[in-house]
């Protein structure tokens, strides 16, 4: 089933299979070098001291470049509560926008299995399938995942993509596509009530050309400001797949850019606070902004209110909210993750997750997806340089 819907008017050549070890100076940096932005404030990252390898994220078909990390909120189908779902953006040839697999890691048994493999050429999804960081599992057991497809690994052949609905056994049951969906990109923010839910997804593909289209002023691919954040309000009938009741563009005007090494840059991290403020990372501008009344607003807030900019942020990507209401955001330009107090706007702490000296700066391009662990004290993250799932713990 494909659902098309009109708009309510008013966002990485990565290191595929190259196995690199963090040793020597890099290991020392990983454990010792953390940057304090404020000595007075304490946060979650200051308590993190261990980084444990859990599993490879490469399935039998050879897909690489793990993106999304999602912790299962319930047991349903083949999934047990607290299982960790990870998807891949690249295929065995390391072409971006061609990954089709989702893996499931079970912390209780340390077992990893293939949860879903979606056909790469899916006619209802414009351009096919290339799974992104935009993935969630609802309390009703349904999985929703974004596709930003390509045929040559660059945005020159990018399709508009879609959102795919899977059941709890990994079967594809519905496709959502339409004029407001174009490269669903960043980690989803969700407000889930069981029989209905609200999703927030960044769309980073509108007007995007290939990386060969260069801005003569910058000598880089041209930057456009057409990326949006889309809110989908869903109803979830008992025993049936979710249905879209309404949809609203709650933010727009974010910077986006094609990139040969990174596929694209665009808004990536989304986190929803209890007061219904939606926080968004804007990597190109190295900032985090706030969208007020995100669950109820009927128009776009533009880019929203600036929360923090620059300093420890270096191409901020995926983001989570801690139990204390702080934001933790992974950097794309180095291997650090950064903690921010969104109320004061203070950047509290930066912590090395990946200090691989093979990149410059260390860890450049190695981090992406992140998810809070059920204990609220730890978090899962993926390392793209060695295609792995890890956990950071006290």
Give the role of each language-model region.
Residues 99-107, 159-170, 223-235:
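Beta-propeller blade signature
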Residues 283-287, 308-352:
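Loop/turn-rich, solvent-exposed surfaces of beta-rich toroidal or solenoidal domains
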Residues 58-82, 97, 119-143, 149, ...:
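Beta-rich, blade/repeat-based domains predominating
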Residues 41-61, 108-129, 165-184, 235, ...:
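Surface-exposed loop and turn segments in beta-propeller and other repeat-based domains
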Residues 105-109, 231-242, 291-299, 341-347, ...:
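Short loop/turn segments immediately following beta-strands, especially the blade-tip
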Residues 366-394:
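Blade-level signature of beta-propeller repeat domains, shared across WD40, Kelch, NHL, RCC1
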Residues 94, 102, 163, 208-209, ...:
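Structural signal for beta-propeller blades
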Residues 89-91, 147-150, 158, 192, ...:
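Short loop/turn segments immediately following the C-termini of beta-strands
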């Amino acid at each position: 089933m494909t659902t098309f819907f009109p708009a309510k008017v008013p966002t990485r050549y990565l290191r595929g299979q190259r196995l690199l070890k963090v040793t020597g100076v890099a290991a020392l940096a990983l454990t010792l070098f953390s940057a304090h932005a404020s000595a007075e404030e304490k946060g979650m990252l200051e308590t993190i001291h261990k980084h444990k390898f859990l599993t490879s994220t490469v399935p039998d078909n050879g897909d690489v470049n793990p993106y999304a990390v999602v912790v299962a909120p319930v047991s349903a189908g083949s999934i047990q509560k607290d299982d960790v779902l990870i998807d891949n953006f690249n295929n065995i040839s390391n072409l971006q926008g061609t990954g089709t697999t989702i893996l499931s890691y079970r912390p209780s048994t340390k077992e990893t299995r293939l949860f879903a493999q979606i056909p790469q050429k899916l006619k209802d999804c414009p351009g096919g399938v290339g799974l992104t960081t935009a993935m969630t599992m609802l309390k009703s057991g349904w999985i929703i995942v974004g596709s930003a497809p390509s045929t040559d690994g660059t945005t020159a052949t990018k399709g508009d993509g879609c959102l795919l609905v899977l059941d709890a056994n990994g079967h594809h049951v519905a496709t959502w596509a339409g004029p407001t969906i174009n490269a669903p990109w960043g980690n989803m923010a969700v407000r889930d009530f069981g029989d209905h839910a609200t999703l927030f997804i960044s769309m980073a593909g509108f007007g995007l050309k290939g990386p060969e289209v260069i801005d003569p002023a910058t000598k880089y691919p041209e930057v456009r400001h057409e990326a949006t954040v889309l809110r989908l309000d869903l109803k979830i009938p008992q025993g049936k797949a979710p249905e879209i009741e309404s949809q609203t563009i709650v933010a727009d005007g974010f910077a986006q850019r094609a990139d040969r090494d990174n596929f694209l840059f665009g808004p990536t991290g989304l986190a929803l606070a209890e007061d219904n403020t939606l926080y968004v990372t804007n990597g190109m501008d190295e900032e985090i902004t706030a969208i007020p009344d995100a669950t109820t607003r009927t128009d776009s807030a533009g880019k929203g209110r600036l929360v923090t900019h620059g300093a420890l942020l270096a191409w901020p990507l995926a983001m989570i909210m801690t139990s204390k209401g702080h934001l933790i955001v992974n950097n794309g330009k180095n291997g650090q993750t950064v903690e921010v107090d969104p109320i004061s706007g203070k950047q509290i702490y930066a912590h090395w997750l990946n200090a691989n000296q093979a990149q410059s700066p260390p860890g450049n391009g190695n981090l992406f997806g992140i998810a809070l662990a059920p204990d609220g004290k730890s978090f899962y993250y993926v390392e793209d340089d060695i295609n792995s799932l890890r956990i950071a713990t006290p």
